[in-house]
């Protein structure tokens, strides 16, 4: 059984992209990463359309969409990080300003990530489908993204210091 065969029936378009990415790894790493990027885009858009939280708008940038999927609890932090890794790998390899072509090593790394991501994708889609069928449509909290929470805390603290300084300048010190 080939690597992406399980996708063939349920997600034929995703299967097509993944299968092509696998076929092109050795002979055309650029094409492999292009197809991996198409597979990534398909997964992100499909998750966005099927998330349980109401979608206010469809994001144009994959970065924003992945972040929102994580914030809404549709996907976990690890899944989001891996989506970003593949996104960055594909973007960097296919950057038109880059003179050299993508390497086979980059394409193999992309394929490895793609393999993991398709497993996670099907699991999340199955979970969302089950939640809709059972009427339990509130996803369980996926946990706190510690990196983002720490960054937000620093920003809030800095904002507080700036606000205090501004108030002191405006109203003067009590001394």
Predicted regions and their residues:
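Membrane-engaging insertion elements
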Residues: 171-175
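Amphipathic alpha-helical interface elements
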Residues: 1-169
């Amino acid at each position: 059984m080939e690597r992406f065969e399980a996708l063939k029936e349920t997600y034929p378009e995703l299967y097509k992209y993944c299968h092509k990415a696998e076929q092109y790894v050795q002979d055309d790493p650029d094409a492999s990463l292009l197809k991996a990027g198409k597979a990534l885009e398909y997964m992100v858009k499909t998750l966005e359309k099927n998330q349980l939280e109401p979608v206010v708008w469809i994001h144009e940038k994959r970065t924003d969409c992945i972040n929102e999927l994580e914030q809404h609890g549709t996907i976990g932090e690890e899944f989001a990080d891996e989506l970003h890794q593949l996104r960055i790998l594909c973007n960097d390899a296919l950057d038109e300003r880059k003179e050299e072509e993508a390497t086979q090593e980059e394409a193999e790394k992309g394929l490895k990530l793609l393999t993991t991501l398709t497993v996670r994708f099907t699991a999340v889609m199955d979970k969302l489908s089950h939640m809709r069928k059972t009427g339990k449509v509130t996803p369980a909290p996926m946990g706190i993204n510690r990196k983002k929470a720490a960054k937000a805390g620093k920003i809030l603290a800095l904002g507080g210091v700036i606000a205090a300084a501004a108030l002191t300048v405006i109203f003067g010190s009590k001394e």
